[in-house]
């Protein structure tokens, strides 16, 4: 049975998703990575003459959701049955995209019919890549030529939808934004580079920089449309059978997901990282092995998209004057900048005392 990796290509109108789906699929197959694509469902509904106008917005998006869900379940089954170690499911939009077009209550109603909710869906995909609409940075290329069903007839409306889509996906475990700072061919190559890095080719590297900042304005963070708070509990264990690893609960209650992570240090900012989802029962079982737990930490993580860059800002219950913010990079010398609203104290990437394990051992409580 193959391990299935679910990757969503999303974004605003005329961002290049359809072309990107074909391009990434071809390139992954060149790398001998079995890939199954799922094309955009909305265009198929519209082609059949079904629209929000003649069906009503709720009924249209409910049917769209059910169509997507059925196809996703079927393609997931097929991917699992493939005779390979890992298979990629590549989506032109995921189940959560329709949330950008309906109210919170409407989405909760039709997702709830299948025992799903926003948080569970957001965490069900392994990576999400947002292709920014050409209406933001490549305005001369915006139009209906590539999609006769495109409904956003102004640049302003297209940018608004782009932000709405980005907002619903903010908080997913791995989100990257591909902007229009280059021509389209290079945009696709930048996307491929991000996808390949996520898949761990040639190695599953994590390159992060971490910064100590002054305690943020929480009210301001909550006002940012592309910001989402995720409660996190993580524990560090060293067991006789599995050695050193980390387990993490991301979210709360029945909306939580559980992840096991093994990291191998390469340099101060570069590590090999191997992550796998685990069940709540596995998480609880690990946590019950108190003799092997070396530290536990709880924090609120604010996932933020600012200036087309994804940041993770962590607020800890034991600090009232400071916090940390991290950014993940593709290379050690990649240029970066921090959001203008954070007040930098200093970079602490290379300071052992600010690693999560050290904080867990100093401040954490079981």
Task: Give the positions of each predicted feature.
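Hydrophobic positions on the alpha1 helix immediately C-terminal to the Walker A/P-loop
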Residues: 20
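ATP-dependent NMP and nucleoside kinases share a basic, alpha-helical "lid"
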Residues: 91-155, 159
């Amino acid at each position: 049975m193959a391990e299935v990796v679910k990757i969503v290509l999303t974004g605003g109108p005329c961002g290049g998703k359809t072309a990107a789906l074909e391009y990434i699929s071809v390139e992954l197959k060149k790398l001998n990575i079995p890939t199954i694509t799922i094309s955009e469902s909305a265009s198929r509904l519209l082609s059949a003459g079904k629209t929000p106008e003649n069906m009503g917005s709720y009924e249209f998006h409910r049917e769209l959701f059910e169509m997507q869900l059925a196809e996703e379940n079927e393609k997931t089954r097929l991917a699992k049955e493939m005779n390979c170690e890992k298979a990629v499911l590549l989506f032109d939009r995921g189940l959560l995209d329709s949330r950008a077009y309906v109210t919170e209550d409407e989405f909760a109603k039709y997702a709830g019919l299948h025992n799903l909710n926003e948080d569970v869906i957001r965490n069900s995909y392994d990576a999400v890549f947002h292709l920014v609409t050409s209406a933001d940075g490549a305005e001369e290329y915006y139009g209906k030529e590539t999609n006769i069903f495109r409904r956003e007839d102004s640049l302003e409306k297209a940018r608004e939808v782009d932000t709405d889509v980005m907002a619903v996906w903010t908080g997913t475990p791995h989100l990257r934004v591909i902007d229009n700072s280059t021509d389209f061919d290079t945009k696709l190559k930048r996307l491929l580079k991000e996808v390949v890095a996520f898949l761990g080719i040639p190695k599953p590297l994590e390159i992060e920089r971490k910064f100590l900042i002054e305690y943020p304005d929480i009210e301001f963070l909550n006002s940012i449309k592309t910001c989402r708070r995720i409660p996190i509990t993580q524990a560090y264990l060293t067991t006789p059978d599995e050695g050193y690893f980390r387990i993490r609960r991301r979210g709360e209650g029945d909306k939580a997901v559980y992840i096991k992570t093994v990291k191998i240090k390469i340099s101060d900012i570069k590590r090999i990282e191997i992550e796998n989802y685990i069940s709540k029962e596995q998480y609880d079982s690990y946590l019950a092995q108190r003799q092997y737990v070396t530290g536990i930490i709880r924090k609120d993580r604010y996932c933020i998209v600012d200036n087309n860059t994804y940041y993770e800002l962590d607020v800890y219950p034991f600090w009232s004057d400071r916090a940390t913010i991290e950014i993940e990079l593709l290379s050690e010398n990649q240029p970066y900048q921090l959001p203008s609203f954070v007040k930098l104290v200093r970079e602490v990437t290379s300071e052992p005392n600010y690693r999560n394990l050290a904080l867990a051992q100093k401040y954490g409580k079981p």
